[in-house]
């Protein structure tokens, strides 16, 4: 497991910057998906079941001013940065594993 920090900026304003930390990349990816699901629940409070497809999730990710991950790499004793495209790839892999 590699400690992972998710850096998030929802708008261009610096005040929208925040971070979340997780014990692993998988937990971070689940956290990002959960963040989108929570947003959908807020937008549709009367809808009992929330469904979405991956293109909607990716559109949400692209709408964020910034989303990146810092993943701890033990052999260099440092955090390695990853961008939105890497996150999207990890989401695809994560969802494929869930579908099996």
Swiss-Prot record:
<dbReference type="InterPro" id="IPR000781">
    <property type="entry name" value="ERH"/>
</dbReference>
<comment type="function">
    <text>May have a role in the cell cycle.</text>
</comment>
<protein>
    <recommendedName>
        <fullName>Enhancer of rudimentary homolog</fullName>
    </recommendedName>
</protein>
<dbReference type="InterPro" id="IPR035912">
    <property type="entry name" value="EHR_sf"/>
</dbReference>
<comment type="subunit">
    <text>Homodimer.</text>
</comment>
<comment type="similarity">
    <text>Belongs to the E(R) family.</text>
</comment>
<dbReference type="Pfam" id="PF01133">
    <property type="entry name" value="ER"/>
</dbReference>
<keyword id="KW-0131">Cell cycle</keyword>
